[in-house]
Regions:
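Conserved small-residue-rich beta-alpha loop and adjacent elements
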Residues: 101-165
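A conserved active-site cap/scaffold subdomain adjacent to cofactor or substrate pockets
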Residues: 223-295, 299
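Conserved NAD(P)+-binding/catalytic subdomain of aldehyde/semialdehyde dehydrogenases
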Residues: 171-258
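Flexible, glycine/charged-enriched surface loops at secondary-structure junctions
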Residues: 94-100, 220, 257-262, 282-293, ...
Length: 435
């Protein structure tokens, strides 16, 4: 039976915090919906102390920002975007339009149609999340989205140059220096100066994730991507240092980021906890990582690989780092995860920044029912049908007529009956089932 050597914060405390977030976000969305640009300006000044003449960057301002980024950093951004673009294109290539004759004269098909306009949120509060621009903007461009707008909060009193560069290189049509719930609301609801989009994508803190949840339906969303989560699955083929490093590597995202170790070795579990404490003494971002580990860190010891799989599927973590003798066992048996990182040679940071898979992934157990952001999220699979012969229309119509009457839909039945009469030459009584 799985046993905890360390538990995270009590669930009731988490629920109370979530309720407070919901209330705050609801108020901000209502304010933006009512007051539009005036609300955006007021909220930006309140939360970010940012009140520019125009939140949208001009071409000259974009070029100025890019000029402030070192050449090597620009080259690294281009390299990372090339990896994301390549994998997204390979994924898109697997999505084929379909047309098939299912019965003589009956043609069914589907087409993959890009969403028309999207808004990409790029976090930049605690850290400038340059990579989030690659994941949303580049992927949307591969999908064929026509209008891509992007928002990121100000960083130290202005646009973050590297984020602007990544947005521009990725293919954003409009770039705004605007953060938080107000940015998401502006893109989704529209203002006097920002035309609304059809879909909001990108990760963010608990407030951004809640804003997306509340806006879903008025616009589409990619998924609910809240504070980062990581699960490290390990056995005694690795040591405590590498496990602790991978746990803290994601815990540093912020004080509410869960980091969990799942192992079948109690010695490794205790070694890892000791290593976490040692590394927190020298880690520059220990303030965030240490708080996350104290409040949301967990260590679970299992008796077998099968039990580890069961626990991992229960947790349904955003990131799952597998460092065992047989990592493919988890690839073949796990069902609930955002993305798997198999073997000690890879790690979550590779996926976060550069390897090419998308880092916008499901959190809070959403991996039970969805995967992460990918090119397919920007494509609507839309079906069509056509009937090309009189015989086919009459034959399908007879079945349809009877099935409609079975459900009590007389007008539905007449849609079928009129075609049975016209194309099949049958005499069917009005609003009655075809015999």
């Amino acid at each position: 039976m799985a046993r905890f050597l360390k538990r995270g914060m009590d669930a009731s405390a988490i629920k109370a915090a979530d309720a407070a977030v919901r209330s705050t976000v609801e108020g901000i969305l209502a304010q933006v919906d009512e007051k539009k640009d005036a609300a955006i300006r007021e909220l930006s000044k309140k939360f970010d102390n940012w009140e520019p003449r125009d939140f949208r960057l001009t071409p000259a301002e974009i070029e100025k920002a890019i000029s402030q980024v070192a050449k090597r950093d620009l080259d690294d951004i281009r390299f990372a975007q090339a990896q994301v673009r390549n994998f997204a294109q390979k994924q898109k290539d697997t999505m084929k339009d379909l047309e098939v004759e299912t019965l003589p004269g009956v043609i069914l098909g589907h087409r993959h149609i890009p969403v028309n306009a999207i808004g990409c949120y790029v976090p930049g509060g605690r850290y400038p999340m340059v990579a989030s621009a690659h994941m949303s903007i580049v992927t949307a461009r591969v999908a064929g989205v026509k209008r891509i707008i992007a928002c990121a909060p100000p960083f130290k009193g202005g646009p973050h140059p590297a984020i602007v560069a990544a947005m521009h290189f990725g293919g954003a049509d409009e770039i705004y220096v605007l953060g938080g719930v107000q940015a998401v609301a502006a893109m989704a609801l529209g203002t006097e100066t920002i035309a609304p989009v059809d879909m909001i994508v990108g990760p963010g803190n608990a407030y951004v994730a809640e804003a997306k949840r509340q806006l879903f339906g008025r616009v589409g969303i990619d998924l609910l991507a809240g504070p980062t989560e990581t699960l490290v699955i390990a056995d005694d083929s690795v040591d405590g240092e590498i496990c602790a490093t991978d746990l803290l590597g994601q815990a540093e995202h912020g004080p509410t980021s869960p980091a969990v170790l799942l192992t079948n070795s109690e010695k490794l579990a205790r070694d890892t906890m000791n290593e976490v404490e040692r590394l927190l003494k020298i880690l520059p971002t220990a303030d965030a990582a240490g708080k996350a580990w104290a409040d949301f860190g967990e260590v679970i010891v299992c008796d077998s690989q099968d039990e580890m799989v069961q626990e991992a599927d229960r947790i349904a973590s955003e990131h799952v780092q597998v460092m065992t003798r047989d990592p493919d066992y988890f690839l073949n048996n796990m069902k609930n995860y955002g993305s798997l990182f198999l073997g000690s040679r890879t790690n979550v940071a590779y996926g976060d920044k550069v390897i090419g898979t998308n880092h916008t992934l499901p959190t809070k157990k959403a991996a039970r029912y969805t995967g992460g952001l990918w090119v397919g999220k920007f494509l609507k699979t839309c079906t069509y049908q056509k009937v090309t012969t009189d015989q086919a229309s009459s034959m399908i119509g007879e079945y349809c007529s009877r099935l409609c009457i079975l459900e009590g839909f007389s007008a539905h039945a007449e849609q079928a009956n009129v075609r049975v009469r016209r194309y099949g030459g049958r005499n069917v009584a009005y609003a009655q089932a075809a015999e």
